[in-house]
Structure formats: structure tokens, C-alpha cells
A protein has these predicted regions:
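N-terminal, active-site-proximal structural segment of metallo-dependent hydrolase catalytic domains
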Residues: 1-74, 297
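Structured beta-strand-rich core segments of catalytic domains in phosphoester-bond hydrolases
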Residues: 6-8, 58-153, 275
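Short, Asp-centered acidic motifs that coordinate Mg2+ and/or phosphate
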Residues: 14, 57-58, 143, 196-198, ...
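Acidic/histidine-rich helix-loop elements
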Residues: 18-43, 111-123, 151-174
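Active-site metal-binding loops of divalent metal-dependent hydrolases
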Residues: 20-21, 148-150, 202-203, 289
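His/acidic metal-ligating clusters that form di-metal
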Residues: 128-148, 160-203, 208, 212
Length: 297
């Protein structure tokens, strides 16, 4: 594990986070056999610890079930920061109302069907987006914030073996269409408020994928590419599933990471740090490490 130099956020800096917390409400038999518990009620304490240690100003969630959202809201009441919730089906937003004022918001789910391809590309309606427009109370700066979770299955290697549960032809195209819908929506909000925007989430797509190239073609820049003080090179991912978990993080290049943070319209040099948080206690909490940026507006 990387030894992290924690730099707290200041009144001049916003800490913006994306976090897939793992949609797992109940314990699994495999964990129970090991005397462990992966239920939401067991894991919420680890999530609260992450937020207590990092103090993000905005958290864009993915795989946040209704139960987990309730548990987090209950837990926040006893924490140093009592985050305010903007509801969204599996993609809620939590924000610091002491620092930020909510100006506007909108939530939506992606279509289940993709023209030209069979099957569902949003089978449990968890693939969605959530937008919040915020005003920074200290200086009046506005920004648009969007969290999203794109379709998860793979497609290029599936052409000759569709029996694999993680394969579905058209999945790459689905992600590109999904993110294109959100980019259009963000254009509307940026046009309305004339301010920077932050787009983040679990994209289920690597840096060089068609979906992520589409984001950059629309003018967004990856925080990793423009951070002036520190840019994380790890992927922030490890094995943590109903069958169990492992106590090591995957050693893969940054380009293969699927949790991304993009910005547009910010001042040059505004993104100071792009990081992932992967402490040892986090192994049984979620397969995705939270990623965050420090941003000056």
C-alpha cells in the first residue's frame, strides 16, 4: 500500500470525491463461513472512517443502495461533518451544507435498450446520473457536479463466447451512448450557469476507451493529466466480492482504471491533486477505492 501524505482541504480548496461503495446489503454465505460480514450495516463504519479522514466537500456515489444511504445519513449525525443527501437511485450526492449551497439538481437513469443491440444495458436500473449545481459560500463561485455509473459488461472479447456472464456485445457502445447523454445534459447546465463542471464516477471503462475519449473530445480534461502537485498512478481496485476479498491492491497502470474524475472550464492550475485512498482497513469495504481531487475555484 502506498504511504499517503494526507493534506487536509482548506477554505480555498474543495475536495471532490467519487466512490463506488459496493451494492451489497446482506452478508454472503462465503463471508459468514469465515466469520466475517460484508453487509451494508457492517461496512458502513469503514465508509464513515474514510470520510472522517479525508473530509471531502462533495461525494459522488455509485452502488449506494437505499439501505446504505440510510445508514450513512444516520452515521453522519455522529460524525464531525453531517453531510446533506441529494437522492439518486444508486448514484446519490453527499455534500457539506456548511460550505456549499445547492442551487439546482437533476437525476436520471440511462435507457435500458441500445439501438442495434439485443438485451438490457441497465437491467436493475442502477446505471444512472445525478447532477448538482453548487455555490461555494466562501467566495460565491459556482460549479456543476455530476456523478454517474455506466454499464459494466465487456464486449470486444465476447464475440466468440457469449456464455460468459460478464460479456455482452454492444457494451462499449452502450457506455459511449450513456456518457454522451450525460455530456449533453452537462452542456445544458454549463450554458445556464456559465461555470466549471466536474464529471466523475465509475465509468467501467479505461482511459483509452471510446467512452472516455468521447468525454475528452467534449473538452473535459482528466484530473490525473492536469494535477499540479500530485497525480495518482494506481488503479485503486482490488478483489472484494460475495465470494470473499483479498488483502492486496491490483498493480495495474493508470490507463486501466475505471474510476475517473474529469473537469472543464476551470482556471489553469486549479486541480492540485488527484488521488486514490487505499488504506489496509479498506480491503473488506468495497472493491473500489475512493478517488478524489483537490480543486481551487
Amino acid at each position: 500500500m502506498k504511504t499517503m501524505e494526507f493534506i487536509p482541504n482548506t477554505s480555498q480548496t474543495l475536495r471532490i470525491m467519487t466512490h463506488n461503495v459496493w451494492n451489497k446489503d446482506e452478508n454472503s454465505p462465503q463471508w459468514e463461513l469465515r466469520g466475517e460480514d460484508c453487509s451494508a450495516s457492517s461496512r458502513v463504519g469503514g465508509l464513515l472512517r474514510v470520510y472522517r479522514e479525508l473530509c471531502p466537500d462533495v461525494i459522488g456515489g455509485q452502488e449506494v443502495s437505499a439501505l446504505m444511504a440510510d445508514l450513512l445519513k444516520e452515521g453522519f449525525q455522529s460524525e464531525p461533518i453531517n453531510y446533506t443527501l441529494i437522492w439518486g437511485r444508486f448514484t446519490p450526492i453527499f455534500y457539506r451544507a456548511d460550505r456549499l449551497e445547492l442551487i439546482d439538481s437533476e437525476f436520471g437513469t440511462y435507457p435500458e435498450k441500445i439501438q442495434g443491440y439485443d438485451g438490457s444495458f441497465n437491467d436493475v436500473k442502477s446505471k444512472s446520473w445525478n447532477i448538482g449545481v453548487f455555490r461555494v459560500k466562501d467566495n460565491g463561485a459556482l460549479f456543476v457536479f455530476a456523478t454517474t455509473h455506466l454499464w459494466w459488461k465487456k464486449s470486444p472479447e465476447c464475440e466468440d463466447d457469449l456464455s460468459k456472464s460478464h460479456c455482452q456485445v454492444g457494451s462499449d457502445e452502450a457506455r459511449t451512448q450513456q456518457i454522451s447523454l450525460l455530456l449533453t445534459k452537462l452542456d445544458e447546465y454549463r450554458g445556464k450557469y456559465n461555470c466549471p463542471a466536474i464529471l466523475l464516477g465509475d465509468m467501467n471503462a479505461g482511459y483509452h476507451s471510446e467512452a472516455m475519449q468521447t468525454v475528452r473530445a467534449n473538452g473535459f480534461r482528466h484530473a490525473h493529466d492536469i494535477a499540479t502537485e500530485y497525480a495518482e498512478e494506481s488503479v485503486g481496485y482490488h478483489f472484494c466480492f460475495p465470494s470473499g476479498y483479498q488483502t492486496s491492491y491490483y498493480n495495474r497502470p493508470f490507463e486501466s482504471a475505471i474510476d475517473h474524475i474529469y473537469v472543464i472550464g476551470e482556471k489553469e492550475g486549479a486541480v492540485k491533486r488527484f488521488e486514490r485512498y487505499s488504506p489496509d482497513y479498506y480491503f473488506p469495504i468495497s472493491d473500489h477505492s475512493p478517488a478524489y481531487i483537490d480543486l481551487q475555484l
